[in-house]
């Protein structure tokens, strides 16, 4: 019996909507990464982008466990002397909740050119409204 090799023309992409209200950041990011990479499909192939589109709604209502709101720090550097900046997770969730979710999902995606294609299929929105209502057919029920 021969091994079946997936071709790019065989890949069918679905749209998954994940409601993040009241859910933990890591759980939402892990679920989104699974759908984005296509690991939930029986024809998963590492060298092809066989994942689905993911829409995450209610990003402002996401929760974290423990003392992460006060203790978890996000770092960046501008490249100039004295350009080191750091922000707490609690402050970022108030100002840029989309960045927090995108950053968490990005950490769970492969760090190569295929990872950039995979991450392009992620759509995150602060509220419950999103412009992809006509494409979405699958609503995630995992919690």
UniProtKB/Swiss-Prot annotation:
<dbReference type="InterPro" id="IPR005823">
    <property type="entry name" value="Ribosomal_uL13_bac-type"/>
</dbReference>
<dbReference type="GO" id="GO:0003729">
    <property type="term" value="F:mRNA binding"/>
</dbReference>
<comment type="similarity">
    <text>Belongs to the universal ribosomal protein uL13 family.</text>
</comment>
<dbReference type="GO" id="GO:0003735">
    <property type="term" value="F:structural constituent of ribosome"/>
</dbReference>
<dbReference type="InterPro" id="IPR036899">
    <property type="entry name" value="Ribosomal_uL13_sf"/>
</dbReference>
<dbReference type="GO" id="GO:0017148">
    <property type="term" value="P:negative regulation of translation"/>
</dbReference>
<comment type="function">
    <text>This protein is one of the early assembly proteins of the 50S ribosomal subunit, although it is not seen to bind rRNA by itself. It is important during the early stages of 50S assembly.</text>
</comment>
<comment type="subunit">
    <text>Part of the 50S ribosomal subunit.</text>
</comment>
<dbReference type="GO" id="GO:0006412">
    <property type="term" value="P:translation"/>
</dbReference>
<dbReference type="Pfam" id="PF00572">
    <property type="entry name" value="Ribosomal_L13"/>
</dbReference>
<protein>
    <recommendedName>
        <fullName>Large ribosomal subunit protein uL13</fullName>
    </recommendedName>
</protein>
<keyword id="KW-0689">Ribosomal protein</keyword>
<dbReference type="InterPro" id="IPR023563">
    <property type="entry name" value="Ribosomal_uL13_CS"/>
</dbReference>
<dbReference type="GO" id="GO:0022625">
    <property type="term" value="C:cytosolic large ribosomal subunit"/>
</dbReference>
<dbReference type="InterPro" id="IPR005822">
    <property type="entry name" value="Ribosomal_uL13"/>
</dbReference>
<keyword id="KW-0687">Ribonucleoprotein</keyword>
């Amino acid at each position: 019996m021969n091994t079946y090799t997936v071709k790019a023309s065989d890949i069918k992409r679905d749209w998954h909507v994940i409601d993040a209200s009241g859910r933990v950041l890591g759980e939402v990011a892990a679920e989104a990464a699974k759908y984005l990479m296509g690991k939930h499909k029986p024809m998963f192939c590492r060298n092809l982008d066989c994942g689905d589109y993911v829409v995450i709604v209610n990003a402002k209502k996401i929760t974290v466990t423990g003392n992460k709101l006060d203790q978890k720090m996000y770092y960046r550097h501008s490249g100039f002397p004295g350009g080191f900046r750091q922000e707490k997770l609690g402050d970022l969730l108030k100002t840029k909740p989309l960045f927090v979710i995108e950053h968490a999902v990005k950490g769970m995606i492969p760090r190569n050119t295929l990872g950039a294609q995979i991450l392009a299929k992620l759509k995150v929105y602060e509220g419950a409204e999103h412009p992809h209502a006509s494409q979405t057919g699958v609503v995630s029920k995992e919690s």
